[in-house]
């Protein structure tokens, strides 16, 4: 049996996992409407020790954050896993499949915050529930915050293990080909409520 190109199968799965983690980071966003045109969610993984980076093109978010009252903050995010883009449609199609994200069965990865705590110097720890491919895990996302005029900007990276979420099944469980570690990265821009 011939396997799909390693890059095609591995990239999408890692990106999907990253998307879920990024959702966690987004949970630290603001009293605001998220500007998805200025915001990004991506996943970085390694295939045969070569970094692979993909972006989620579609996501929605509901956030409420005031840096003066971080404990009162909350966020919910949903990422369309079929929107994961590795820059090649054949790769994108592979990662949407059953062995990777199984987008037909599990169309969205979600994050719902449960607590936000200050971590010093514009940093926050955002705790919440990350769900990818039907598997839910408690996570803590380190998030940095800065005020940029009327906008609030949140950045962060959440490391996850793809196999914990059943991303990369069958022959793709082999972590010597596609690493288990995935970095979910996010840059979220939101405009304060008026």
Residue ranges and their predicted role:
Residues 2-20:
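Bacterial N-terminal signal peptides that target proteins for export
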Residues 30-194:
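Low-complexity, acidic/polar, glycine-enriched regions of mature
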